[in-house]
Amino acid sequence: MPLVKRNIDPRHLCHTALPRGIKNELECVTNISLANIIRQLSSLSKYAEDIFGELFNEAHSFSFRVNSLQERVDRLSVSVTQLDPKEEELSLQDITMRKAFRSSTIQDQQLFDRKTLPIPLQETYDVCEQPPPLNILTPYRDDGKEGLKFYTNPSYFFDLWKEKMLQDTEDKRKEKRKQKQKNLDRPHEPEKVPRAPHDRRREWQKLAQGPELAEDDANLLHKHIEVANGPASHFETRPQTYVDHMDGSYSLSALPFSQMSELLTRAEERVLVRPHEPPPPPPMHGAGDAKPIPTCISSATGLIENRPQSPATGRTPVFVSPTPPPPPPPLPSALSTSSLRASMTSTPPPPVPPPPPPPTTALQAPAVPPPPAPLQIAPGVLHPAPPPIAPPLVQPSPPVARAAPVCETVPVHPLPQGEVQGLPPPPPPPPLPPPGIRPSSPVTVAALAHPPSGLHPTPSTAPGPHVPLMPPSPPSQVTPASEPKRHPSTLPVISDARSVLLEAIRKGIQLRKVEEQREQEAKHERIENDVATILSRRIAVEYSDSEDDSEFDEVDWLE
């Protein structure tokens, strides 16, 4: 259906009804025809004015664009011809901070809008009948839609096209996302190396050189493998930390504990002996083989293991680990080096217990108190320890660089009474903190009031001289389990704090999701009825490699 933009009136010049009572009809028809011609000429002049007015507006806008382009060309010509690169250096900041040129030309779209309606069409539209007043029912609708749009909606077809374009764009984006996820889930296939063509030139050259000069095929292949992948002995020549020449007077068993500890501390490789591997069975020796077999020391467990080595080799490698073992306990004066050497070479010695933990100070309160390790003294000398002291409240202390290790209970081996007297005295007890300080970690006072029954014997089973391990504390500092707390805790309840924190985290996540949703909605609302933006978004999604690149030109179109 053609749309008539301009209509010239009257269409018919002579098709008119003559009034009655006219005597000269020919003269009347001539006058009516001339009057209609004049009216048509006036319509033509009016429409000519509209046409030339539109042409004038187009020419004016074109001249404005040409003038702006000429000004830009003049500025560029001046800067290009007069700029001397030897004298004036263009700073990098001017290049990076300068914005790219952006055209201010409005794209031709929405040609058939109410704002772009020409004057002749507006006059024709005004002549038409008015639609029924359905907008009166709009305030009574619950969906918020205009009532007149159910009767007539000029933007219906454009909205339908816009919805389809946006849906296609979203479908393409989802398809790309699924394809990307499928590519990530698919295992990486190794690149197939094409088979090299078979060439017998090398074989003929070998035959021409003779068997004396020709190299062996295996050696040549080995050289090619070494060139491609490195020497074959790369995995066999790793530097291993071991100690050789450990037989005779230079054996490990003949060294004192200080040199042994220093030797084990130098290790820089990982341990080559599994800590939980059972010892191999001792090899069978002949009657004339009386050479003692030194033991292999594994520092992974910090104990001496009875690991016989093979007597076939002249050297006894001792593999050590990079972690230095704990220093052995000080030897009493009654023990000599010869007795130690004899005890290490003859029979497997008992495992050496780990050293006791260092005494904790007032500012170092471990979260879990380690169980006390019994000393290696005679069974009749062990003195019952006093009841544990309830740790008073201390303030939070700065983090300690290294926590005290928790020692495990080891069997106590009895020693002679002479060796017990040569032992050094136990370390003094740690000083008690002032009563107004809180501990760095919460410790239950009632749990500490009951010591383990297996660690402290009764006083009746410990006769002889007493070796006090810790001075008895005054009874005022010992808090029994049945006594309630005197000072109520002012700290907030942990469950409430955690619940508040979790609630805040949930609210933060919810707010973030709502903000992202609003941003997406605002982004879609900014599109409005911009055909160029909708098409550019679809083209960007179709031709972009990644999902993020689909929004790169949206801001340029909207600004």
Swiss-Prot record:
Residues 182-202 have a biased composition (Basic and acidic residues). GO terms for biological process: actin cytoskeleton organization; cellular response to brain-derived neurotrophic factor stimulus; lamellipodium morphogenesis; mitochondrion organization; positive regulation of Arp2/3 complex-mediated actin nucleation; pronuclear migration; receptor-mediated endocytosis. GO terms for molecular function: actin binding; Arp2/3 complex binding; protein kinase A regulatory subunit binding. The modification Omega-N-methylarginine is found at R341. Residues 497-514 form the WH2 domain. It comes from the Eukaryota. It is found in: Cytoplasm, Cytoskeleton; Synapse; Cell junction, Focal adhesion. Residues 170-202, 304-400, 412-492 are annotated as: Disordered. Keywords: Actin-binding, Cell junction, Cytoplasm, Cytoskeleton, Methylation, Phosphoprotein, Synapse. Residues 304-313 have a biased composition (Polar residues). One of its GO terms (cellular component) is lamellipodium. Component of the WAVE1 complex composed of ABI2, CYFIP1 or CYFIP2, BRK1, NCKAP1 and WASF1/WAVE1. Within the complex, a heterodimer containing NCKAP1 and CYFIP1 interacts with a heterotrimer formed by WAVE1, ABI2 and BRK1. CYFIP2 binds to activated RAC1 which causes the complex to dissociate, releasing activated WASF1. The complex can also be activated by NCK1. Binds actin and the Arp2/3 complex. Interacts with BAIAP2. Interacts with SHANK3; the interaction mediates the association of SHANK3 with the WAVE1 complex. Interacts with ABI1 (via N-terminus). Downstream effector molecule involved in the transmission of signals from tyrosine kinase receptors and small GTPases to the actin cytoskeleton. Promotes formation of actin filaments. Part of the WAVE complex that regulates lamellipodia formation. The WAVE complex regulates actin filament reorganization via its interaction with the Arp2/3 complex. As component of the WAVE1 complex, required for BDNF-NTRK2 endocytic trafficking and signaling from early endosomes. Also involved in the regulation of mitochondrial dynamics. Binds the Arp2/3 complex through the C-terminal region and actin through verprolin homology (VPH) domain. This is Actin-binding protein WASF1. It comes from Bos taurus. The gene is WASF1.
